[in-house]
């Protein structure tokens, strides 16, 4: 991860073609970055555009935007794209620099007996299926630093102009998910739609948000026809989260604005949730049409819950 960030910074140039940062300066940043991860305090929070040492107040000489983009160059461990008939099984993934396994723009995918150990690693997602169809995912174990089992479907208006398939026809069952930000996690890339998902017979423990559905005001698309049933959740911060107010601080890309995404046709049956610190259910539509035209009036609809049991709900639940 450090090598890719250094290479990115070394290739940046000024308007006259000269190098923006010297090797000496780039090499000196290692300590800053390590301390930032250790105590969450090295990037200045007061509106300045430079990367600074908050202890001494000295300017480290690097733009914040360049640090953000360099950090985003960390490589994922395994990426497959535009493939048909994929089987991933009987492997262990340990401490990836970024995402663990991503299968994109593909069809007919099976993932079985994959063990992912990326807990406390930033963006250490477990198994991800982006713009892929006909996915079966079962008997896996994920102990992750970010989302455990995730989906995505492109972003922005440009996604509609491309021949990109929806993320659909997904069956996930008999998985054990531990730690992580989201157990079942769909979005925030929703531009071409995520739909027709059956998620069942799964145990989730110490997940921040067990069922996590997210989009941002400009990503567009939808999440629809999601069924969650026969699952057990313990020690979570929030059980169900549906929001169009999500933003990714590590994103290094920009896209043409799309109409705001919507969530509809969600069904949850026979789910037990024990130990909820905050919300049992949060549904948020980010609406601000007067101040921000990219946040028009929209609603999420047709959300059905049956035989849901909550226990030991916290004071904020």
Feature locations, PLM:
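Extracellular/periplasmic carbohydrate-active domains that bind, remodel
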Residues: 1-317
């Amino acid at each position: 991860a450090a090598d890719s960030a250094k290479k990115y910074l070394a290739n940046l140039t000024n308007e006259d073609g000269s190098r923006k940062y010297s090797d000496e300066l780039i090499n000196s940043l290692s300590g800053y970055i390590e301390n930032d991860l250790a105590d969450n305090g090295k990037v200045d929070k007061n509106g300045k555009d430079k990367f600074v040492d908050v202890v001494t107040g000295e300017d480290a000489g690097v733009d914040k935007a360049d640090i953000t983009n360099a950090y985003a160059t960390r490589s994922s461990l395994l990426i497959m794209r535009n493939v048909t008939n994929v089987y991933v099984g009987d492997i262990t993934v340990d401490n990836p620099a970024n995402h663990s396994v991503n299968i994109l723009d593909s069809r007919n995918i099976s993932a079985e007996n994959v063990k992912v150990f990326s807990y406390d690693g930033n963006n250490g997602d477990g198994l991800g299926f982006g713009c892929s169809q006909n996915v079966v995912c079962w008997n896996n174990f994920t102990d992750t630093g970010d989302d455990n089992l995730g989906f995505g479907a492109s972003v922005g208006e440009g996604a509609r102009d491309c021949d990109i398939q929806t993320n659909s026809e997904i069956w996930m069952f008999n998985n054990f998910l531990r730690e992580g930000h989201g157990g079942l996690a769909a979005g925030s890339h929703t531009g071409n739609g995520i739909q027709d998902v059956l998620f069942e017979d799964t145990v989730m423990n110490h997940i921040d948000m067990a069922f996590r559905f997210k989009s941002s005001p400009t990503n567009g698309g939808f999440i629809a026809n999601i069924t969650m049933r026969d699952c057990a959740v313990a020690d979570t911060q929030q059980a169900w989260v549906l929001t169009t107010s999500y933003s990714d601080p590590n994103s290094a890309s920009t896209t043409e604005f799309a109409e705001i995404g919507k969530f509809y046709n969600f069904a949850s049956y026979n789910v037990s949730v024990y130990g909820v610190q905050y919300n049992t259910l949060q549904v948020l539509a980010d609406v601000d049409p007067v101040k921000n035209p990219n946040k028009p009036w929209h609603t999420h609809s047709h959300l059905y819950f049956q035989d849901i049991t909550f226990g030991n709900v916290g004071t904020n639940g």
